[in-house]
């Protein structure tokens, strides 16, 4: 099933004031996904090869993507189950003909959405054009939707404990920050390894309509991690993350805080409530 909908540019990670202007919908929204395979439902718990191209208004496949250091390159493939219970985040290679291919294992059955976060190279500037394209998928098996759950300031996943210190009152279009400490199973500060050009990723989806934005947590030695973005996250010592965020809509949101600790990708889900 296809849902070829382009959304506005993501907020990325960069500097911001107490109130920011949200980015407009990108003109690149006329680009669309083509040739998505497989065309039908996919299995849960087994690797499946997905492939597609992004086609431009003139019918040619997009082949010019931003490259280099930092997270604002190529495409991010973010698969999210529609009840916001699970997420898979990948950064696949792109073939010279524009084909995007990746092997994905879906952890659970049900309705999923692929959000392709695109960083397209623009001529005459180093700033990529950023926009998103959506694709619906069905994963075979019995679907039992899970509630989003209450707001909690501490989550333990894979033995690592993520704790938010002083939850702010979140409001639409206000730049704000979450200060999060992360400890390993022994209670010591966790050490993150750069992953997809950032020290950690904060992926946000709104419950219901799946509105999206994505920011990055950057350490001082990560070149271009915070480039050309609306609000920055940062980390200056092990186990301490400062997450930048600005919400485009009120409602209930899920934050998937992701990072590489050792050789493992760890994802901590938090429920958040945003006021208008």
Predicted regions and their residues:
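Sec-dependent N-terminal signal peptides
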Residues: 1-5
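C-terminal motif of bacterial Sec signal peptides marking the signal peptidase cleavage site
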Residues: 8-12
